[in-house]
Amino acid sequence: MKLLPIWIGITAYLSCFGIITSAQTETVTISIQHELKETETPKPISWVVVPDGSGRSLLVLQGGQVLVVPADRKQSKISSFLKLSPDQMIVKDFEEGLLGLVFHPKYRSNGLFYLYHTLQSPKRSVLVERRVKDQKKLALDPNHNRTLIEIEQPYWNHNSGVPEFGPDGYLYLSTGDGGKANDPHDFSQNTFSLLGKVLRIDVDQTEGALQYAIPEDNPFKGKPGYRGEIWTTGMRNPWRLHWDLPSKTLYCADVGQHQKEEINLIKRGGNYGWSFREGTGEFSLKNRKPSSEFEFIDPVFEYGHDEGTSVSGGIVYRGTKHPELY
């Protein structure tokens, strides 16, 4: 029996999707059915299980609303968990908005969770800590709203980012390259910038003026010319991360430009090539060559736009309900 990662492209939502794996090239077709037929769910971003044993989930919408989906949808109605103002987050209705939500590993004892979203005036992305004061009712503490990170965003696209906790208890955050096309400011390879990276921080501690601490084993902590938060460089628009906790493997779906969509295995200190490369091939529109000290990590899987569109994310499936996924 093989355990296979499942990755889904945007076109998957039309009627059915192919399961593309790094372990093999075969495609398994399964059907998709509507789960929330009577609920307005514009631009769903993610589905997050509430880690309290209740069976409830949160449906995160890019426009700023988070819905509570009960375990028994026949007996209980969907309700609102929180709602952010779209006017404060979004100027151009494309990639801006509420992009990620993750619960703290010790949520049952501290009630904490984290949002990643854009803000305007000035244009920026923020990682914010919030708290649930009544876990049974999923009621928010209105007085707990702590901003940990603010990242200036030059444009309205490539704002991608999703926070995920690793098995080490640290928070990993993917960030886009700042937008437009061709990475015009070379942020992805700029080690002073937090754009075009995967970051790793300790949200349970503070350090100096920071609202978080930088783990001692981060690859660039204390290295001149580098931000210590950086875990990897060379990302374009890493829309989703997924931790396969049993194998302690971090997967990343990095959206391409014109040539390739990438699935990457995230490694400590790795450089994934953008904008010198797109996928395993040279990115010729920049008309430049990397110097000899650059070492790039190839994606474990890539596909061209003749096969599909934007890679949107995925999971490693370890269940037994759908044996065709093995």
Residue ranges of predicted features:
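N-terminal secretory signal peptides that target proteins for export/translocation
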Residues: 1-2
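Bacterial N-terminal signal peptides
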Residues: 5-18
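Generic hydrophobic-segment detector
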Residues: 5-8, 151, 224, 303-304
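Acidic, Gly/Ser/Thr-rich repeat motifs that build Ca2+-stabilized beta-propeller blades
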Residues: 23-182, 240-256, 307-326
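Beta-propeller domain segments
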Residues: 52, 60-63, 96-98, 106, ...
